[in-house]
């Protein structure tokens, strides 16, 4: 009974959200109008859809060009080669062609939460890519890295140009799915991307490309994670400005 009520509530809320998403997420259009070449910077194959799908789909909806730089092959269980392919498929499912996806495969940047990535090496590789592609905005994790994975956090600490970071929310909000929308709406700082129903489905389809990652707990993640439907981001320079003043 309670479950049914919850599901019904979720559906209603969602319907309302997807209808109002243009109002709710009106700011991306404005703040990102001048951006020419945004880059999504991730640590592992699957970050793009597990955490950033609403952003990716939101940007593509605005006809923004987008490319992806993934800093490891996700080789923790020796599945690097498979996971690289899964990333390409998943990006295609989201609407990013393989020509816009780059994977760094460096033995000193292993997919491993216990290894602190060498900041100089990482910075070198990322900045080279940024220059080559004339990237003017980098979108990546914030200092908490959403899941707390140290590779995610390394990315935050590495880049120095115009950067927008994905806000990590507490664990309670993280698994509220779309019920987190009112909270996100009230408290987001710069940009809010809310997926429509069809975009949510698209994100799930992209996640299905990561077959090697679909262990039982990931299915639970997919069901309840707010990051499958909602992304709130803020500009890093705003952050710095606040700290300076
Ligand atoms: C892929 O990258 C190219 C060159 O930066 C860009 O023109 C194009 O719009 C991008 N495609 C997508 C779907 O973002
Ligand atoms: Zn990751």
Q: Where in the sequence are the language-model features?
A:
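The feature marks non-catalytic terminal segments
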Residues: 1-15, 160-245
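Active-site beta-strand->loop->alpha-helix modules in alpha/beta enzyme cores, enriched
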Residues: 1-160, 215-216, 221-223
